[in-house]
């Protein structure tokens, strides 16, 4: 594993430049779904017991992207390689997770808190750590609990299937989960609760979410309350993107010091208004006394 990057002002500025480039790339290539898939699949190999796998960029190596569950993922890796060359300071691990965050945001999803500083690794985990779409609730829990995630995380993250479609050459399944596979919303859950969503895909792992009573409670909540889904999804996505990763203190210090100019202006304006009100009140009181 390589050394952790130094997350200073220069690194954070590079991250913001990469974020802008990612927005342009995703818009021009309509590749949000596969960018989200890349971020998930790099992170979703984490094992909390052995502290191996996770969002470390190892998916860029053939021994990992050739896993059956990663069929087609090389497309995303290749799309991001020129960007890595433009922003060499940023680690692959950070770039892949940033791509997932941007993919959600530019398609209408929630803003996800992103903290950089991940190390790159060339140590790929053994095959079989990612979810198998042909299995059910017990399998989902086995996979996600191994990562250290919860039932709520399982359902919230499954809502990411609102983006994209399954392809036979990659998974053996064919079709989209929603009517607009390039829009991030809560329609995945709405369709799940319908007995017949004609022309839309429902994998065995999708059906497990409505068949299992604990999972179903979250499905029903997210189907009727998109704000609740967005809130929980953003929280779960952040957890997934930081599995096995301890954000460097320098990143938090930098973020806390970067108060937006608009906010500073609002604060200054607020102080000025408050001062004016106090002065006006003082003058009024003085006039009363003089009268």
UniProtKB/Swiss-Prot annotation:
One GO CC term on file: membrane
Residue spans of biased composition, Basic and acidic residues class: 116-133
Membrane topology reported for the UniProt record: Single-pass membrane protein
The enzyme's E.C. designation: 1.11.1.11
GO molecular function, one term: L-ascorbate peroxidase activity
Pfam families: peroxidase (PF00141)
Cofactor(s) needed for function: heme b
Keyword Calcium: yes
Keywords, comma-separated and alphabetical: Calcium, Heme, Hydrogen peroxide, Iron, Membrane, Metal-binding, Oxidoreductase, Peroxidase, Potassium, Transmembrane, Transmembrane helix
Places the protein is found: Membrane
SUPFAM superfamilies in the record: Heme-dependent peroxidases
Protein family membership: Belongs to the peroxidase family. Ascorbate peroxidase subfamily.
Protein name per UniProt: Probable L-ascorbate peroxidase 3
Organism of origin: Oryza sativa subsp. indica (Rice)
Source organism phylogeny: Eukaryota, Viridiplantae, Streptophyta, Embryophyta, Tracheophyta
